[in-house]
UniProtKB/Swiss-Prot annotation:
Keywords: Ethylene signaling pathway, Stress response. Residues 23-46 are annotated as: Disordered. This is Protein salt-induced and EIN3/EIL1-dependent 1. Coiled coil: none annotated. It comes from Arabidopsis thaliana (Mouse-ear cress). It comes from the Eukaryota.
Length: 93
């Protein structure tokens, strides 16, 4: 459809694009965010994440198994790691 036909239909096909950002501003903001992460203790190694399932809520959760994993919805300790077959069965609180 050409622009003349579109204007006959009452459609506005003009695209307003904002001017591009200065690349120096992008570099400055990304380096400052890295500094703030390091100040907050985020500069350490990344924790490995696993996908587990809660049989109570019938919901999947992405979590780290290093700490005490719980379902965010029902606070249950019973989480099933369905990819590797490991079960983290503990008493429900």
């Amino acid at each position: 459809m050409n622009q003349e036909a579109a204007s006959n239909l009452g459609l506005d096909l003009k695209l307003n694009i904002s001017p591009s950002l200065d690349s120096s501003l992008l570099t400055e903001s990304s380096s400052s965010s890295l500094c703030s992460e390091e100040a907050e203790g985020g500069g350490g190694e990344a924790k490995s994440m696993v996908v587990v399932g809660c049989p109570n809520c019938i919901m999947y959760i992405i979590t780290s198994l290093e700490n005490d994993p719980r379902c965010p919805r029902c606070n249950s300790h019973v989480l099933l790691d369905f990819l590797t077959g490991n079960h983290s069965k503990k008493s429900t609180s």
